[in-house]
Amino acid sequence: MDVLELLRVSGSNMYYSTFLADAWCYYISNQITMTMYLYCALGVLSMLFIGWFVYFKRLARLRLRHEIARSLSAVTMASGGDLRGPRFRKRDKMLFYGRRMLRKMKNVSGQMYSSGKGYKRRAVIRFARRILQLRRENMPLEVRTVEPPAEYLEETMEGSDRVPPDALYMLQSIRIFGHFEKPIFLRLCKHTQLLELMGGDYLFKITDPDDSVYIVQSGMINVYISNADGSTLSLKTVRKGESVTSLLSFIDVLSGNPSYYKTVTAKAIEKSVVIRLPMAAFQEVFKDSPDVMIRVIQVIMIRLQRVLFTALRNYLGLNAELVQNHMRFKGSSQGAGPSVYCSQTTRQATGSASATATAAAASGTAGSTHTAVPRPASSLSRYSQDEQHTLSDPNPGIPNLELSGDSVNTLFGEVNGGARLNSYPPLYHQRESDGNLSTRRGSITQQEQPEVGPVPSIDMRLVKSSAVDSLRKELGLPEQDAHIIDPFVEVREMEPNVTLITEGNADDVCVWFVMTGTLAVYQGNADATRIKQDKTDLLIHYVHPGEIVGGLAMLTGEASAYTIRSRNHSRVAFIRRAAIYQIMRQRPRIVLDLGNGVVRRLSPLVRQCDYALDWIFLESGRALYRQDESSDSTYIVLSGRMRSVITHPGGKKEIVGEYGKGDLVGIVEMITETSRTTTVMAVRDSELAKLPEGLFNAIKLRYPIVVTKLISFLSHRFLGSMQTRTTTGAPGAPVEANPVTHKYSTVALVPITDDVPLTPFTYELYHSLCAIGPVLRLTSDLARKQLGMNIFDASNEYRLTSWLAQQEDRNIITLYQCDNALSPWTQRCMRQADVVLIVGLGDHSHLVGKFEREIDRLALRTQKELVLLYPETASSKPANTLSWLNARPWVTKHHHVLCVKRIFTRKSQYRINDLYSRVLLSEPNMHSDFSRLARWLTGNSIGLVLGGGGARGAAHIGMLKAIQEAGIPIDMVGGVSIGALMGALWCSERNITTVTQKAREWSKKMTKWFLQLLDLTYPITSMFSGREFNKTIHETFGDVNIEDLWIPYFTLTTDITASCHRIHTNGSLWRYVRSSMSLSGYMPPLCDPKDGHLLLDGGYVNNLPGHLWRYCRASMSIAGVFPPFCDYRDGHLLLDGCYTNNVPADVMHNLGAAHIIAIDVGSQDDTDLTNYGDDLSGWWLLYKKWNPFTAPVKVPDLPDIQSRLAYVSCVRQLEEVKNSDYCEYIRPLINKYQTLSCAGCPETYGLNPSDLFSEDEDCDGYISEPTTLNTDVRRYQVPRGGNSLSLSETEMDMDSDVEMDLKMERKMDKATQSTPPLQSKAQILRRKHSKEEARHEWEIKREQKQELAREQELERERELSQKGTTAGATGYTPNAVIATQTSLIFMDEEDEMDKKKTKDNDRDEVRGSAEDTGKEKEEDKENRSNTNNETKNYL
């Protein structure tokens, strides 16, 4: 909240309509008198206390004297009355008084718990506690631990003692070729040899045969590369357990082509022992196990593609450098070509080879890994025959093929917008978006309209025969096997610019053989999406006659990463993917020839990189590198998930970031040559590629473009890290560390009990995720159906892992539905999951089952989140969430999900599948809790931040209405000060009517003066004790915890004990809301019960951000007005959050929100101050102030200066939020309302949302320009009627008739504010009649506009459905909706004209009323005052 206006004590301030300012002035004027009275009262009380103390002391002495005298008289009587008789001996005296004292102590101890002096003492203590407020309330239940468990941040230190070191090193080294069964591994071990090298000895030199895999058992080996000028560069240093090998040489050796070292040498740095494994050993194994050979070649091709043709291109900018510029044609293919391929009618000269040839070997690869299911032989043969029959028919009526952005005709038909000919369906029914694909296709420039001409019938037999013979030779098949491929070979003749396959297409992958003409290979610009320019595809290379293309995509089974078009009139022969797989079953050796064709295209640079690359496999919990280790390499995550953890000097560990597939790890530390700043460990089983420092240096020297690419890449990382550090403040975090983004690729779903409807829940979540992008749902039954009943056996582990990796690559998210028991499938789901969702029923028992504990044991480092389901018919809100969380300390986050009735219906599995087969055809509800959960999992959550501003915060109600009408869902809410109160109300109710009602009731309570007067106290810390203020917030929320809210919520307070801001995501709601509203000087800070820290209004450091009411109260602790709120957890004092961050959009972004709407209602400082020179006289200011004939000066007074100093941090944070690219900053028209004018809240609640904004940034009510955060982000469809200015009657939050009457009455009152005051009775009647007519006309126009808006919305839906562009790609962007739905926020021009017309009519009717009598004037005033009073009473 803001204290600028309140602290300015001036007699000219007449706008303070609250008693608070008057009370403050009264205190200042009577301070001396009050202090004197107080000192007198304290003096009297002190004297009474001293007199009471002296009296009792003297009374005790008198009693003691009487006892002594009585004892002496007794002794005298015993001695015969002679005072001079025997005296009272000392020992007898000691015994006597000892017995007396013991007798008294016994009596006192017996009376302590009954009555007497002990009872009085306890009564005094109780009275003192009541006076000094030392009582301690019963503390509510709290979360036991909010920190992650120790295993979550620690690596696994267990070793593999059962395996000998040499066997372990060899096993790890040959894993780059895939998984080998134990018998095959033992056969390979028989061929190993041990080599002992001294320092300086060569392991291999140039011209030595490259036919072995070398594994360092001990010592160190340095690998060098020789340049053309004779100089050498170090590529990498091979240490213990690492290997030296080349995957490309491995394929050469298997293909029968001898390979030699041409530019690479290896020398021992010190005495070393090396294990040598000849590659010929693999040939013997592959003869007996051809299926293993196919698997090994596929693994090699996949890894080469992911690193060489993805990582080096994206991170280093290498394209043309990855392939050879020229390739020698095979004599057999080229010699037989021209005489057979070309005919008199179709022959055309091919273009000259271009020098810009680039990644030819990779043409037709990339994207997601998914292998299509091959068709049966009969269907493929019949399919090919039909296709040949169509081609052999000399029908000239073949349609033209055109290239456009929306619909691209390819060789197989229309890709987008029409049915694709001869395309195979995917493995599963998935809902995918073609938005990215259409963008890539549309970027190819069409030169002329292409046509596909039929092959003349007279040449068809010879052309087909020659094509079969050429493809047979390319595949390495003998002549007698020509009949195997003959049914699958197809021939096409194309005009220029015909697209064979598009980038990202996985259905039309083929092996293409060029017979005549030339094919052009293109690839999308990797920087186009980032720099928003140069979006045309890059020309990679040309494919000439006798060359084959598409082998890499065929071997990897992934989608094509390139677009292939005919450059001129061309004729091609091709075999489809399913046919190749069928041929591969009969002749497995064709994979070697396809792989060899890929390898022959690669440049020497790729081979050198292949020697330097290392492939690393990490099990869950293993460390990639540790903090303070030397950094000599960087890593590329190929699969899995990594976590970066920093260890502080005190031993505390903190998460810095997480890395997923495709991320680069440790590059900044390697380039800067500094030690590792964090420890990086594997969250789950992961695969990485290691790029050493020497390789980077060699590439930088040869290709300077790499330096430019690295600078651009590191600049973006540095900018992102700077925005993160401003809020997190982690000084030791590396620059390239990613924040812990909540974007997962694999999700495991685990039921707590058997009665949890896990299958319907998975279907509902799948339905919501389909609106964001391609998603896949996997169960144990589906896995067995696709891969066989024995797929979960140990022998099939690699096959299952590879298949799951392909599914994960093809989809943005994969759902793993676990079984209800600890089956092998459940264990596999735990190993594959990035996050585990533990699903339970919210109204059932919270006890932890045995199965759930086993799940935690299997995935120690995997993040786990709790999902509690509630029926839609449930009348109560979530409760007892703390019991669920305390029983599961391993849970890091929880979600409350409201479910429809069909989820809890007891049905068989077959009926459930049948039900959701129909449900999946409908559009998901983007406002449902399932959609909110889907956006959270994919990293597309939408956050709403409500800033502080005192009574101006009532405008948040109007903003909530506007957001609701615009169809924008709210996934997370954060607030400060009054924003904490409004945000907590929305998260608790999620109904604008209830929120408005409770907010009005709270505002009415704040305007009751007699309650506030009773709360006044001696202003040492604050003006008010805060007891009544606590009561109003407590009555609003009750004993609700933040954990029980439907929507994730946080509030921000200022901790004056630790001098920082605090973010509250759990605990007592009302307390932290109260603390966030503790404005300094008015309320005492709230004492945090956790640690005893004092918390103030969070707006002092960041003005846009247990039991629920406590933290709400803490967030509203206005310093000086209300006392700081003491946190019941640690005792820290909490104040209003506006002192640190009044609009905590940055905090919301760090909590996982991708798109944020920030609403600022704080006051604006006057920056137009008077320049008074080098010194300032207070007498001169007093003269300027009192002299009405001098020009006024603007000089801040002492309270104003102190207030501005308190808000320095807040202003800086606000500017950063305005300039951020993830936030949409909005400021309504609320400057005319004062910070503490709670009496104006009802008027603010009644404002139309469209009346709160203006397009001028300088004016109050500003909306920042919408920025496009992601061009591929899905824009949800706005609900029908959402684009209309008028409120739909079906969406009215209150009673529609009464609400419209009140709105119309307010508009009429505004129109008549400037009219003359004197009116006759006839004029008053005419004005009322005109009001009714204007109201009727306005309602008619409103209905007409609603109908027109509905018709326009329906028409737009039809157009979108026809174009097929309603599917999304990644998520939802509120900025786009705000940009397109401006009419929902800004004032409608027609409504302005209506109000202006009504105002003019009223002005004309009342004109000439100046001669009316004073009696009529009084009657008119009375009528207007009655009307206003009735309206206010209703509000």
From Swiss-Prot:
Positions carrying Phosphoserine: S443
Q: How does it sit in the bilayer?
A: Single-pass type I membrane protein
Q: Which residues lie on this side of the membrane: Lumenal?
A: 1-35
Q: Where is the composition biased (Polar residues)?
A: 435-449, 1311-1322, 1425-1435
Reaction equations catalysed: a 1-acyl-sn-glycero-3-phosphocholine + H2O = sn-glycerol 3-phosphocholine + a fatty acid + H(+)
Residues binding a nucleoside 3',5'-cyclic phosphate 1, per UniProt = 176-303
Which Pfam family, just one, is annotated for this protein? cNMP_binding
List the active site.
S977, D1097
Q: What is this protein called?
A: Neuropathy target esterase sws
Q: Which organism is it from?
A: Drosophila persimilis (Fruit fly)
